[in-house]
From Swiss-Prot:
Protein source organism: Homo sapiens
Subunit organization: Microtubule inner protein component of sperm flagellar doublet microtubules.
Presence of the UniProt keyword Cytoplasm in the record: yes
Protein name in UniProt: Sperm microtubule inner protein 8
Subcellular compartments: Cytoplasm, Cytoskeleton, Flagellum axoneme
One Pfam family per UniProt: SPMIP8
Lineage: Eukaryota, Metazoa, Chordata, Craniata, Vertebrata
Amino acid sequence: MARIIDLVPWDDGSTHVYASPAILLPMERQRNQLAGVKQQLYHPALPTLRHMDRDTVKACLPDEHCQSTTYCRKDEFDNAHFTLLGVPNKPLQCLDITATGQKLRNRYHEGKLAPIAPGINRVDWPCFTRAIEDWSHFVSSAGEFKLPCLRKRAEGLSGYAVRYLKPDVTQTWRYCLSQNPSLDRYGQKPLPFDSLNTFRSFGSSYSRVNYLTPWH
């Protein structure tokens, strides 16, 4: 921005400088060569593809093209808050042992760490070697449900909820049985090509089929 300055003549023939107030004219922004002001990877005003395409269509000269010039100054690049060059002054604590970790390590070597809280027995802790037995007992004790009687003519299976785990564990229904053919608001949906052969073919020896895997 610039201010208009007028030279006002006086009666004695001298000339005094008079600045007219509140009259500002916009000045054209100065373009700087990108290589002269930028020494980092960070670009405060990164040119977009649209700007570069526009300058290419306008056949702008190199000193006018946004790919080689910028309105940013050198101090704006120097004071950038992000850069991928150089080593940070203060490295992250996660890259090395923290101060708390060093204290605990020293106390551990000195034998000053507190023992296990009273009431907790190591025998009661979960043992990974008994995981298979625990899982087998858990699955065998899981509840089962029966499907309704199939003697009725209009019997559908859509919407019946099934689960892998007991309700005490999952608290939600994860899977639902779907019926083929099924209906939507437009009518009957197309029948899949493998619906009638679901229980006739046993799949390939190189892949496991979902219906051969028990869900209970």
